[in-house]
Amino acid sequence: MRVATRRSRALIRATRSTLGDRLEPLSAELKWLGGALGPVRDLDVLLERLRVEVAALDLEREGGESIVAELEAEREVHRADLLAALGSDRYLALFDTFTAALDSIPQELAGTAQTLAAGELRRFEKAAAAVPEEPTDDELHGLRIHAKRARYTAELGALTGRKRFVRYVDAVVAAQDVIGAHQDAVVAEERLRALVSPERALAAGRLIELERARRRDSRARYREVVDEAITRGRAAVA
């Protein structure tokens, strides 16, 4: 559901030149929903990898299990907040507004998929060109956001069945995955550092080592997959 909210907001942003600002209230409500979904989804991603890594620990396992247990308890708190949001009148109103938009908007956007994809590709290219040889974590995260936006408009083009757009989608998804793995590792290390205590120190240190290895791997690979995505994108929108 969080992916759907992000995709919808990205498409609203991309179609602003065609549709104007009339969907901005919907975008704001989708942002609210994404904010409710985010903490649970982020913890799901983090816990999925930590459970596997902690199970492979030896002497440090008890400390690792303590970290996992605290994160699981935090997830339950956020899950309760999410369920409250999904049961609210605000969510029901959002659902009705979104459904109405789906009924009316597609006709206005017929034939614009290639134009939308080309616009987001240009922004993706510009962002990629601005990334220095040794980017900061924030610079890579910003590039990831542009990759996601490019992906969502590319998916519109792929709905036409054009093979070049299908190949573009595959390539930009690969780029997003590599850069996303870097951001996941950054977030994981931050969370682990916040949970360090004397009895967890060895486990946290070992888990942080694994996250840093993921970051190094992503940094070594991201430029190649980004360049491939841009190449595929140029072919798709030509």
Where are these regions (language model features)?
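Function-determining surface determinants
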Residues: M1-A238
